[in-house]
């Protein structure tokens, strides 16, 4: 072997290793370069642009099909959804939303929440509730227990105190039956016809001494003079009636009557019948006039103020704040039971909506060839460095085989 030609034996392994090591980078660049088509004399130069830029749309479709066919399958998406929608995560999300809603209510300067709640209350009380009550009132047992309880615990036990009875007696004697009203009632009662009937009845039905007085004197003149006195002497009549009321202690008599007035003094049978009548009266009233009552009540109430007060109270209530976690947990459990049954159907419906394959295609198509080249080179350099090294080793081995073949061929 002529050692003067040593470079003939050494150069094949060295060149093979160098070529094998840099082949990947060269191949990647050849796939992408040039990025755009080159035209000479109006004709496109062959192999321009590079293979990937020229077929980028088809590459995007193939990448999308590969990912959706082997990586993001419906089963994998279901597993991903189950991991994402674990009960703890769902509960945390619901709790966050509830707290966010309460914070939004507190800072609602336009009172949008109050207007919404006001509309709900107005519809509930003014529209829905009257229709519901009208239907329920047809039942014989409608509000039976509630009305009986109110009757037994309130109406049956209702009794005026001494102060209340005194005030009511004063009002009765000063407003309902003052002396002037009594005087006018006497005048209206003592008509000529009434006086004649009283006089004749007194003459016919009396006996003994009263018969003598009735037939000799009669009551006609006396009653006529009384009526005339009430008409001519109004002030004097009122004074006499006031004195009579005081002498007869009518105020104290009325007070005692009112103070002792209670349903407990009535017979048991009467109380039971009164309770039944009360229940039927309430039921009949709700059937006939309940809708109008609630409608009038709805029109007279400022629902926005009520809704605002209600929301302020609820947003600052410690009970509401402490119950948010419980509510979120219950809602999360309900959602979990629903997903266990219908998750497969939901995922099947969500996949077309998300259009993941089209997103991948659009993303690959919108990426410039230079960015694709840089991404692939980064992957090769960081994750596939062994392939680069293996290319150099294979090039070295091929070069060694060439050297060995060259040596054996000379011998």
From Swiss-Prot:
<keyword id="KW-1003">Cell membrane</keyword>
<dbReference type="InterPro" id="IPR016991">
    <property type="entry name" value="UCP032178"/>
</dbReference>
<keyword id="KW-0997">Cell inner membrane</keyword>
<feature type="transmembrane region" description="Helical">
    <location>
        <begin position="387"/>
        <end position="407"/>
    </location>
</feature>
<keyword id="KW-0812">Transmembrane</keyword>
<dbReference type="GO" id="GO:0005886">
    <property type="term" value="C:plasma membrane"/>
</dbReference>
<comment type="similarity">
    <text>Belongs to the UPF0754 family.</text>
</comment>
<keyword id="KW-0472">Membrane</keyword>
<dbReference type="Pfam" id="PF04286">
    <property type="entry name" value="DUF445"/>
</dbReference>
<dbReference type="InterPro" id="IPR007383">
    <property type="entry name" value="DUF445"/>
</dbReference>
<protein>
    <recommendedName>
        <fullName>UPF0754 membrane protein Ava_1421</fullName>
    </recommendedName>
</protein>
<feature type="transmembrane region" description="Helical">
    <location>
        <begin position="3"/>
        <end position="23"/>
    </location>
</feature>
<keyword id="KW-1133">Transmembrane helix</keyword>
